[in-house]
Regions:
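Short, flexible loop segments at boundaries between secondary-structure elements
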Residues: 62-65, 127-139
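Glycine/small-residue-rich loop that forms an oxyanion/phosphate-binding "nest" at active or ligand-binding sites
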Residues: 1-26
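Short glycine-rich anion-binding loops that position phosphate/pyrophosphate groups of nucleotides
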Residues: 39-41, 108-110, 134, 170-171
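Anionic-ligand binding region
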Residues: 31-32, 36-79
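N-terminal phosphate-binding or glycine-rich loops at protein starts, especially the Walker A/P-loop
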Residues: 161-173
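Short acidic-hydrophobic, aromatic-tinged amphipathic segments that line or gate anion-handling sites
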Residues: 12-20, 140-150
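Short, ordered loop/turn segments at secondary-structure junctions
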Residues: 1-6, 108, 133-136
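A C-terminal functional module that forms or caps the active site or interfaces directly
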Residues: 70-124, 129-131
Length: 173
């Protein structure tokens, strides 16, 4: 059971379905790229022409990740190893420091700091490439409330689904 959120603002970024589509798009344009997609996507980013000059990667500061980055040739000032979450201000600083013309991110939702990244890009005039979340089977908030109401009333026999509450995010401070 997943209640799908509503998109509140019109999207003003480039959307792609996969890291490969992002690489293809970013290979067709010029400019520095600030990548916040994580270490699992780094190999694909190495397909971008001049990636060692164009790509700045923000990754988790673990020894395995740092070794992987070194092996791929993403080192020195092009490697930012820090643990989030990051505020809009912090993201803005990274974009300015790297002189990024492109922000590459996943649609990670509230818990992944997606809004802070997009706001920082807007403030900085940085264009954004977003890797969409895979389509998932979900229900509306109203449908989820109805399922919960039936379960609360003891009408579990009427339910044709299992109800699991998991991964509800970090919440607002």
């Amino acid at each position: 059971l997943r209640a799908e959120g509503e998109q509140k603002k019109a999207r003003d970024w480039v959307e792609v379905d996969s890291i490969q589509e992002a690489v293809s798009f970013l290979s067709s344009v010029s400019g520095v790229i600030f990548a916040t997609t994580g270490s699992k996507e780094l190999e694909a980013l190495c397909q971008i022409p001049d990636y060692q000059k164009r790509v700045y990667a923000r990754v988790l500061p673990t020894s395995n990740v740092l070794k992987k980055c070194e092996k791929l040739g993403i080192t020195g000032s092009h490697l930012i190893a820090m643990q989030g979450p990051f505020s809009t201000e912090m993201n803005t600083l990274f974009l300015r420091q790297t002189k990024a013309e492109w922000l590459l991110t996943k649609d990670s939702g509230r818990a992944g700091g997606f809004q802070e990244k997009v706001e920082a890009a807007r403030e900085n005039g940085t264009r954004v490439v977003v890797i969409r979340r895979p389509e998932e089977d979900g229900i509306s908030l109203e449908e989820a409330m109805e399922v919960l109401k039936k379960a609360d009333e003891g009408n579990v026999g009427e339910l044709k689904t299992h109800l699991i509450l998991a991964g509800i995010g970090m919440g607002q401070p």
